[in-house]
Amino acid sequence: MIIKREMRQDKRAAPKAPINENISAREVRLIGADGEQIGIVSIDEALRIAEEAKLDLVEISADAVPPVCRVMDYGKSIFEKKKQVAAAKKNQKQIQVKEIKFRPGTEEGDYQVKLRNLVRFLSDGDRAKVSLRFRGREMAHQELGMELLKRVEGDLLEYGSVEQHPKMEGRQLIMVIAPKKKK
């Protein structure tokens, strides 16, 4: 299916504020380029002031009576807003859920390696999902799996707290541990 370019709308495009001649009000409350209140003036007077300053007249609040307009460089303000949004997005930390898989018969050496990885995940600020998979006849001894997860919980007390207590999902016993908040 072919969609014409004019028909497509960019969902990311923010609704643009009316500027200059696109402002429909007859009178506006005007704010100058340096932020000072000029007062209520006619739209023609506001456009003249903006033109003298070689800037744009931008409608800030259409809901107010009369609408609030400001004299500013519209292109520059859009650029600054985009820059702020990009900086805020960059500073967000994505919390991930890391998973470590155990078996009911996990030996001590393997247990220590997996525990070390869990400590690293929690120290990095990620949540950890501990899953214990049962195969075949191991399902008859689910208490061994519960003991193992209780041991993991006890060993990780200083690094995190249990967010989701152990529960069975099919043939797996699953527990989620959240990192402790850093002070």
UniProtKB/Swiss-Prot annotation:
One of the GO biological process terms: ribosome disassembly
GO CC terms: cytosol; membrane
Intracellular or extracellular location(s): Cytoplasm
Gene3D superfamilies given in the database record: Translation initiation factor 3 (IF-3), C-terminal domain (3.30.110.10), Translation initiation factor 3 (IF-3), N-terminal domain (3.10.20.80)
Stored InterPro entries: T_IF-3_C_sf, T_IF-3_N_sf, Translation_initiation_fac3_CS, Translation_initiation_fac_3, Translation_initiation_fac_3_C, Translation_initiation_fac_3_N
Major localization class: cytoplasm
Pfam families per UniProt: IF3_C, IF3_N
GO molecular function, one term: ribosome binding
Keywords from the named record: Cytoplasm, Initiation factor, Protein biosynthesis
Keyword Protein biosynthesis: yes
Family: Belongs to the IF-3 family.
Record's subunit section: Monomer.
Classification via NCBIfam families: infC
Biological role: IF-3 binds to the 30S ribosomal subunit and shifts the equilibrium between 70S ribosomes and their 50S and 30S subunits in favor of the free subunits, thus enhancing the availability of 30S subunits on which protein synthesis initiation begins.
Protein name, per record: Translation initiation factor IF-3
GN (gene name): infC
